[in-house]
Amino acid sequence: MENLQKMISEKSVVIFSKNSCCMSHTIKTLFLDFGVNPTIYELDEINIGREIEQALAQLGCSPTVPVVFIGGQLVGGANQVMSLHLNRSLVPMLKRAGALWL
């Protein structure tokens, strides 16, 4: 859990993902299309990927990827991110976190 806390506090937008997950790809593309430069951790490529997945599960994230943190706060998975986007709450959240300026 300590590694997870350090990872999410380093940048304004952090995405935990897996290369094999199509929803992870969709969420990463959404943020990149906004012009946001998220820190992306591919859990199937890093040594502590399983440990991070377990920590995400302990936070209640199911499925464990994709998971998005904005401003150090858990936003959730693809469903939560898309809901925020559709109700026009995502961009203001990104601006408040300093991840988006326009």
UniProtKB/Swiss-Prot annotation:
The keyword Protein biosynthesis does not apply. [2Fe-2S] cluster binds at C21. This is Monothiol glutaredoxin-S5. One of its GO terms (biological process) is response to nitrate. Gene3D superfamilies: Glutaredoxin. May only reduce GSH-thiol disulfides, but not protein disulfides. SUPFAM superfamilies: Thioredoxin-like. Disulfide bonds: none annotated. Belongs to the glutaredoxin family. CC-type subfamily.
